[in-house]
From Swiss-Prot:
Biological classification of the source: Bacteria, Pseudomonadati, Pseudomonadota, Gammaproteobacteria, Lysobacterales
Annotated active site: 131
Reaction(s) catalysed (UniProt annotation): uridine(2605) in 23S rRNA = pseudouridine(2605) in 23S rRNA
Biased composition (Basic and acidic residues): 314-333
Ranges of Polar residues composition bias in the record: 371-380, 408-465
Basic residues compositional bias, start-end: 354-363
Keyword RNA-binding assigned: yes
Residues that span the membrane, as ranges: none
Protein name as it appears in the record: Ribosomal large subunit pseudouridine synthase B
PROSITE patterns: PSI_RSU, S4
Family label: Belongs to the pseudouridine synthase RsuA family.
Gene Ontology molecular functions: 23S rRNA pseudouridine(2605) synthase activity; RNA binding
Length: 476
């Protein structure tokens, strides 16, 4: 036999090759936090130095690195470092007035993040900010590195605005000398600022319209520049950020996503890597309570056979679980429509204490029974003597009609107390109609009489006419 190995057969096998573990990513903590959009790197480094961030339960140190799977705590929230594999996304949002560019506003004002598309496993990061009265273009992205690069002053990204200005007091329009001063530079509270470009695009009787360009993103920079010269800004709208323009067809409060080709062009313009490598980001932790491994300890030397489950007595545990017991009367299986209200829904101990107590009696709902002495009750149940209330020989037959077939009925020729004769069928014959209390007001009226027939009172019947209709009594 030769020692040459046999070629592999095409048979199936349950054996699996040992999978090679993917290398864990490791990055600086402040970079991971910035990638998640929690702030600038400089501000995050300051927070790390102040001991406001924890990694795996320990206070983080400046310059430390984190790996995928590490738990990071910041501002009372917990995150887990994980790899970011999805490509960057950029959103164009036409911001209306009245919205603030923040996630949570202490004053309860509406924010721009309330109307944005929902993301899974990522979050929108605002590229710059617009104050509550400024409208127009607002860029948001899922790439924290791209957002920081576009906001950094060293990138010198142009921001273009359209502004409506009221001229200083005593002047009809904004003078050219004032515009030249704004392009040279004006001293503000946080340093010198200027407009890179100022273009007059129109005017009215009381306002002037301008198109201005700045390369910095200071807080309310455009408004403060005009206010430093005695002008008042009444309208301010951003129309361009770098190479991204606000689409004309995009309405206020609506958003649209930037194509991937333009996103890659932005990264190239900012000298970022074309193909974004794997990076670490933060994913929020969903609060879940995981129970520890169960351990049962039994003391065999104890005569009472006490057991302890995870350092807790099983007797105590059963006492705690007893509160979840639901005692009820076992009923037959119905269609599931009726719910019994007399079952016990208290704990076992409370039910044992209440065992001697009777069930609670509930008052009937919507009780429409009439009170005693009500006239309606009297009229409904009062039947004059000698008036039958049902067919002959019926079990519910009333007085004067014979309640039982073996009993003899009264003489049909005799008159009753109301002046009517008793017939075999009380409602079939005309002179045997029942009288009710309401008829006592007109005792001579018989609604079932025939024309010309005398009533018991000796008065002519009021029925008759063309259609033999019932009529009320007529008096001369």
């Amino acid at each position: 036999m030769s020692d040459t190995p046999k070629p592999p057969s095409n048979t199936l096998s349950l054996k699996r090759e040992t999978a090679t573990e993917a290398p864990k990513l490791e990055e600086r903590l402040h970079k991971v936090l910035a990638q998640a959009g929690l702030g600038s790197r400089r501000a995050l480094e300051q927070r790390i130095s102040n001991g406001l961030i924890k990694v795996n339960g320990d206070i983080a140190q400046l310059g430390m690195s984190v790996k995928s799977g590490d738990k990071i705590e910041l501002d009372g929230r917990s995150f887990v470092a994980s790899a970011l594999t999805e490509p960057a996304r950029v959103l164009i949002y036409n911001k209306p007035e009245g919205e603030v560019t923040t996630r949570e506003d202490p004053e309860g004002r509406p924010t721009v993040f309330e109307t944005l598309p929902v993301l899974k496993g990522a979050r929108w990061i605002a590229i710059g900010r617009l104050d509550i009265n400024t409208t127009g273009l607002l860029l948001l992205t899922t790439d924290g590195e791209l957002a920081n690069a576009m906001m950094h002053p060293s990138s010198e990204i142009e921001r273009e605005y359209v502004v409506r200005v009221r001229s200083p007091e005593g002047e009809e329009h904004v003078q050219d000398e004032l515009l030249e001063q704004l392009t040279r530079g004006v001293m503000l509270e946080d340093g010198t600022a200027k407009f890179d470009t100022i273009e007059r695009i129109g005017n009215t009787d009381s306002h002037d319209w301008f198109r201005v360009v700045v390369k910095e993103g200071r807080n309310r920079e455009v408004r403060r520049l005009w206010e430093s010269q005695g002008c008042q800004v009444s309208r301010l709208k951003r129309t361009r950020y770098g190479s991204v323009l606000l689409p004309r067809e995009l309405l206020r409060g609506q958003s649209t996503e930037l194509p991937k080709t333009q996103v890659e062009a932005l990264r190239t313009q900012l000298k970022l890597e074309k193909d974004m490598p794997l990076a670490l980001t933060l994913q929020p932790v969903i609060g879940q309570r995981r129970s520890a491994k169960a351990t049962l300890h039994v003391n065999r030397n104890d005569n009472n056979k006490h057991a302890y489950h995870n350092n807790h007595s099983t007797a105590d545990e059963s006492r705690e679980l007893r509160r979840f017991d639901t005692l009820r009367d076992d009923r037959g299986r119905g269609q599931g429509k009726h719910h019994f209200k007399d079952r016990l829904t208290v704990s076992g101990e409370a039910a044992a204490k209440q065992a001697h107590k009777p069930f609670k009696q509930y008052k009937p709902k919507n009780d429409r029974s009439l009170s005693e002495g009500s006239p309606a009750t009297f009229q409904s149940w009062y039947v004059p003597e000698g008036v039958s209330t049902g067919p002959r020989n019926h079990r519910n037959a009333g007085a004067g009609n014979g309640a039982h077939p073996n009993k003899k009925s009264p003489n049909p020729n005799t008159r009753n107390t109301q002046g009517q004769q008793t017939r075999k069928s009380p409602y079939k014959y005309t002179n045997n109609a029942p009288n009710f209390p309401s008829d006592h007001a007109t005792p001579t009226f018989n609604p079932y009489g025939n024309p010309g027939q005398k009533t018991g009172a000796g008065q002519p019947n009021n029925s008759g006419g063309k259609y033999n209709r019932n009529r009320g009594p007529r008096y001369p």
